[in-house]
């Protein structure tokens, strides 16, 4: 008999810095997952992506075991890092907070390609450009 997935948990955690404190501890504790085991496995798997916010999708099975998939960092956090800003604009139509080059958009789109709903790099760039526009970041061609 195959293991059944009882719960799916989606968390955004700094790569290499998972610990039992919130938000990790309470989310996994409710699903009765071995928290120290998850933290050590997650930190080992993400040690090369230091200081990036990554999304972990955790599947919890009926025997309390788990597996997890690590997705690429959110586009907004990659754009903030590329533009050297802490936050995007609250009113992106009027207030522009930064300017980045199209080459940086292309680099981010290449990194995000596996997680985006796009088949070509050109369409992935358009998705990332739209995110940048909504954050108040100007893209120079």
Swiss-Prot record:
Annotated GO MF terms: large ribosomal subunit rRNA binding; structural constituent of ribosome
SMART domains from the UniProt entry: RL11
Gene Ontology annotations of biological process type: translation
Listed HAMAP family: Ribosomal_uL11
Subunit: Part of the ribosomal stalk of the 50S ribosomal subunit. Interacts with L10 and the large rRNA to form the base of the stalk. L10 forms an elongated spine to which L12 dimers bind in a sequential fashion forming a multimeric L10(L12)X complex.
Function description: Forms part of the ribosomal stalk which helps the ribosome interact with GTP-bound translation factors.
Protein family according to the UniProt entry: Belongs to the universal ribosomal protein uL11 family.
Name of the protein described by the UniProt record: Large ribosomal subunit protein uL11
């Amino acid at each position: 008999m195959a293991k059944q997935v009882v719960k799916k948990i989606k968390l955004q955690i700094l790569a290499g810095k998972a610990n039992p404190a919130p938000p990790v501890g309470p989310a996994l504790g409710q699903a009765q997952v071995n928290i120290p085991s998850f933290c050590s496995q997650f930190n080992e798997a993400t040690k090369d992506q230091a200081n990036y916010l990554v999304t972990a999708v955790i599947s919890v099975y009926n025997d309390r075991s788990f597996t997890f998939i690590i997705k690429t960092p959110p586009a907004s956090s990659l754009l903030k890092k590329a533009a050297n800003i802490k936050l995007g604009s609250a009113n992106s139509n009027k207030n522009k907070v930064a300017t980045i080059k199209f080459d940086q958009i292309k680099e981010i789109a290449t990194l995000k390609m596996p997680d985006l709903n796009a088949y070509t790099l050109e369409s992935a760039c358009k998705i990332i450009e739209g995110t940048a526009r909504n954050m108040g970041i100007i893209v120079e061609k």
